[in-house]
């Protein structure tokens, strides 16, 4: 009788790969090309084997079907092209680090896309996200899952069929901008005890259709559902700053968690091609409106990180925009907060991955995360063994930084989801 290999010699990813029966070749394609990187990231967070199985099974059941038909390269005549990543992939991975020994978490971002997206059957790509959320509502393990905020904000900030017909008739969309109609995407936080679902909305289409300025549209929709649980003065300070400094545009995003309203934060996102320290400082302090000790301590940490990374400063948009992507920013407000929590997303794609990794390693050590700092570059190479870090510019997509009095330094690093499709410049 032949000997049996020890079951402990196989990882959860390898075990699942052996026995998975895929509904279609499309879903098998994405499992083969993207699940292994996700498995490596999950292990990086010191998840238990049971959690690895759980999260990978969730990825198979509820993430891949959102885009399984989609291919991450140009397809002539395709009616819809994803806009959530610079690599052209419809999904993105990130790891959040906070209080490093206890709190590291993987997040998966995805744009739900039906096969009919961009066609007469689903012209503004609404179908798939509704289908996904309806299915998630039946998953018993998602104990905190709640659709109240989705139902409200999807109506308040996304277009109806009538509004879309009006937009098409008036031709207010730039014809050359293939992702101009995109209005939503999703995120999945792989937390210790369950998966938390996040929604991201882009309200510019609703603003165009209704003729309502974005500042007014966002303020009204937030007050209508949160009433006074989101501090009105804090929200007004952020909205007024963004409005007065021309920060509301087609790239403005709004997000919330699909959990009970009393617990869900809200976030406002934007982008700016002025990738300079002075611009980052202005965004961090909300135009100088917040200069308290916590804000300024966070700013000092951000400056330290900024100086360690090979950032290319740009005051204006270069001719080859894709090679010099924008800086992103966000403001998070939780129920009861009297100040917003700023977050700066430093563009990592198109920067040398070895230099980025070295800069991050140094920063992690300086803030007391010695183990992470010592292991970071080796871990990155182990996830992408076929990539030469000295030549690669595709593995890091964003490096996000935040700081709060309660949590201290909070880092979120975004990565290419599949080395099979590296971003070529």
Curated annotation (Swiss-Prot):
Enzyme Commission designation: 2.5.1.-
GO terms (BP aspect): alkaloid metabolic process
Signal sequence segment: none
Keywords carried by this UniProt record: Transferase
Residues reported to bind L-tryptophan: 83-84, 92
InterPro entries assigned to the protein according to its UniProt record, in alphabetical order: Aro_prenylTrfase, Aro_prenylTrfase_DMATS, DMATS-type_fun
Pathway(s) annotated for this protein in UniProt: Secondary metabolite biosynthesis
Pfam family, one: Trp_DMAT
One example GO MF annotation: transferase activity, transferring alkyl or aryl (other than methyl) groups
Domain of life: Eukaryota
Quaternary state and interactors: Homodimer.
Family as reported in the entry's similarity comment: Belongs to the tryptophan dimethylallyltransferase family.
Physiological role: Aromatic prenyl transferase; part of the gene cluster that mediates the biosynthesis of the indole diterpenes penitrems. The geranylgeranyl diphosphate (GGPP) synthase penG catalyzes the first step in penitrem biosynthesis via conversion of farnesyl pyrophosphate and isopentyl pyrophosphate into geranylgeranyl pyrophosphate (GGPP). Condensation of indole-3-glycerol phosphate with GGPP by the prenyl transferase penC then forms 3-geranylgeranylindole (3-GGI).
Name of the molecule in the record: Aromatic prenyl transferase PC-22
Organism annotation: Penicillium crustosum
